[in-house]
């Protein structure tokens, strides 16, 4: 049986963050499932929703922000201060990290506009 970490170890850590991905690998998952969105300046970021409202302290659509603007928002907002501030990771950041890890990646492109 294969164990997939949905949005990383999202039951214990902020979803789709580098911390959630690292903790999922440490816990022994075989695969990480993540979601990607495209910013206004064409940077691929790891985030489930088209809007940033649910998982960050910002509002609006990912596509309306450049990555420089987007990374100011706290991707750990839902955890009420339990974790330090975390930026939304870029897909490149994830790829640079995961290339040395013993897991596969399931990537979902979540958008209704492309």
Residue ranges and their predicted role:
Residues 1-114:
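Phosphate-group recognition and catalysis centered on beta-loop-alpha active-site segments
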């Amino acid at each position: 049986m294969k164990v997939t970490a949905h949005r990383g170890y999202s039951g214990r850590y902020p979803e789709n963050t580098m911390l959630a991905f690292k903790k999922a690998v440490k816990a022994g998952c075989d695969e990480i499932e993540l979601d990607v969105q495209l910013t206004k300046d064409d940077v691929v970021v790891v985030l489930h929703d088209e809007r940033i409202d649910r998982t960050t302290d910002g509002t609006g659509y990912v596509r309306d922000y450049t990555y420089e603007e987007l990374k100011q928002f706290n991707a750990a907002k839902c955890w009420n201060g339990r974790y330090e501030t975390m930026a939304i990771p870029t897909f490149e950041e994830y790829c640079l990290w995961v290339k040395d890890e013993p897991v596969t990646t399931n990537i979902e492109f979540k958008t209704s506009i492309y």
